[in-house]
């Protein structure tokens, strides 16, 4: 059974458990039920950080329509690992990860665009182009790149 764990973060960066519940599955309905359980206790988050799961995102929009969602970079990086490491190859993986980190850790839009352009140029070869396309379609699509956060 999946566990829905709501965590809060203090202004000093400390985390604490707000609550948790077991879900019958991982569908939009399951997540919506879990979020409504929290809502019954007047838990109204200012922002929700998710792993990118569409069912979760849809449930948040249903239950907490005015709450913005952000993407957890750790989970994004796990997806990048599972989708790109075999294509990039073990010998180039560390370099690929370092270049990807410079993209996602950019502090300004200008720095991001510059780093992304360098990344695309460096990995515009038959071996890694599929990874570049994956990153662009899955994680850097319009409006998505601004939602990547370290949590």
Give the ranges of each region predicted by the language model.
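Extended amphipathic alpha-helical interaction segments
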Residues: 44-151
